[in-house]
From Swiss-Prot:
Function: Binds directly to 16S ribosomal RNA.
Pfam families, per the entry: Ribosomal_S20p
InterPro entries named among the record's database cross-references: Ribosomal_bS20, Ribosomal_bS20_sf
MF GO annotations: small ribosomal subunit rRNA binding; structural constituent of ribosome
Official protein name in the record: Small ribosomal subunit protein bS20
Annotated spans, Disordered: 1-20
UniProt keyword list: Ribonucleoprotein, Ribosomal protein, RNA-binding, rRNA-binding
Family: Belongs to the bacterial ribosomal protein bS20 family.
Organism in which the protein naturally occurs: Campylobacter fetus subsp. fetus (strain 82-40)
PANTHER family named in the record: 30S RIBOSOMAL PROTEIN S20 (PTHR33398), SMALL RIBOSOMAL SUBUNIT PROTEIN BS20C (PTHR33398:SF1)
Gene Ontology CC terms, in alphabetical order: cytosol; small ribosomal subunit
GO BP terms, alphabetized: translation
Length: 88
């Protein structure tokens, strides 16, 4: 247990930050999975909707500081490439 007031505050902040990051990490995985499942089922419309949702959320994670811009772009690009295989 923390002995100083500042250490107690840091511990509280760490807990809040950990919870927030867990939420973002879970959301990121679920969005990615939604696109992959739609592609696996061969449903192009569902895949495009899921990709649009993933793109929007990934870039909002960038603005919140959870992801770096390059990381979000790379993830969206890979998902878009996967969705484009349905068109062929």
């Amino acid at each position: 247990m923390a002995n100083h007031k500042s250490a107690e505050k840091r511990a509280r902040q760490t807990i809040k930050r950990t919870e927030r990051n867990r939420f973002y990490r879970t959301r990121l995985k679920n969005l990615t999975k939604a696109v992959r499942v739609a592609v696996a089922s061969g449903d192009k419309d569902a895949a495009l909707v899921a990709l649009k949702d993933a793109n929007k959320n990934f870039h909002s994670f960038v603005s919140k500081g959870f992801l770096k811009k390059e990381t979000a772009s790379r993830k969206v690009s890979r998902l878009a490439k996967l969705v484009s295989t349905l068109a062929a």
